[in-house]
Amino acid sequence: MNPIISAASVIAAGLSVGLAAIGPGIGQGSAAGQALEGIARQPEAEGKIRGTLLLSLAFMEALTIYGLVVALSLLFANPFTAS
């Protein structure tokens, strides 16, 4: 394998996980903060807010998992090498 392709694949894998985690991390923090604020204002709506929060957190985390899948495919099933 060409060492330049190998090095670029490792760098791209790290960047894909890192960049894929930035947006969902910010979104999850914001969503959790807003949910806590909503629960503080209306404690009787805690169950509904918590359920909606957990569902939305799962959807946000899926974006990070897609970045991990891209990184793993670059590391172990690299499409840029001729095998």
From Swiss-Prot:
Q: How is this protein annotated for GO cellular component?
A: chloroplast thylakoid membrane; proton-transporting ATP synthase complex; proton-transporting two-sector ATPase complex, proton-transporting domain
> Does the keyword Membrane feature in the UniProt annotation?
yes
Q: Please provide the record's keywords in A-Z order.
A: ATP synthesis, CF(0), Chloroplast, Hydrogen ion transport, Ion transport, Lipid-binding, Membrane, Plastid, Thylakoid, Transmembrane, Transmembrane helix, Transport
* Location within or outside the cell: Plastid, Chloroplast thylakoid membrane
Q: Which InterPro entries match?
A: ATP_synth_csu_bac/chlpt, ATP_synth_F0_csu, ATP_synth_F0_csu_DDCD_BS, ATP_synth_F0_csu_sf, ATPase_proteolipid_c-like_dom, F/V-ATP_Csub_sf
Q: Which superkingdom is the protein from?
A: Eukaryota
* Entries under CDD domains matching the protein: ATP-synt_Fo_c_ATPH
**What are the transmembrane regions?**
3-23, 57-77
A Pfam family assignment: ATP-synt_C
Molecular functions per Gene Ontology: lipid binding; proton-transporting ATP synthase activity, rotational mechanism
Specify where it is mainly localized: plastid
Membrane topology type: Multi-pass membrane protein
Query: Where does the record place the site Reversibly protonated during proton transport?
Result: E61
Q: PANTHER family this protein is in?
A: ATP SYNTHASE LIPID-BINDING PROTEIN, MITOCHONDRIAL (PTHR10031), ATPASE PROTEIN 9 (PTHR10031:SF0)
Q: State the family it belongs to.
A: Belongs to the ATPase C chain family.
Query: What's the further remark here?
Result: In plastids the F-type ATPase is also known as CF(1)CF(0).
Q: How does it assemble?
A: F-type ATPases have 2 components, F(1) - the catalytic core - and F(0) - the membrane proton channel. F(1) has five subunits: alpha(3), beta(3), gamma(1), delta(1), epsilon(1). F(0) has four main subunits: a(1), b(1), b'(1) and c(10-14). The alpha and beta chains form an alternating ring which encloses part of the gamma chain. F(1) is attached to F(0) by a central stalk formed by the gamma and epsilon chains, while a peripheral stalk is formed by the delta, b and b' chains.
**What role does this protein play?**
F(1)F(0) ATP synthase produces ATP from ADP in the presence of a proton or sodium gradient. F-type ATPases consist of two structural domains, F(1) containing the extramembraneous catalytic core and F(0) containing the membrane proton channel, linked together by a central stalk and a peripheral stalk. During catalysis, ATP synthesis in the catalytic domain of F(1) is coupled via a rotary mechanism of the central stalk subunits to proton translocation. Key component of the F(0) channel; it plays a direct role in translocation across the membrane. A homomeric c-ring of between 10-14 subunits forms the central stalk rotor element with the F(1) delta and epsilon subunits.
* Designated name of the protein: ATP synthase subunit c, chloroplastic
Originating gene: atpH
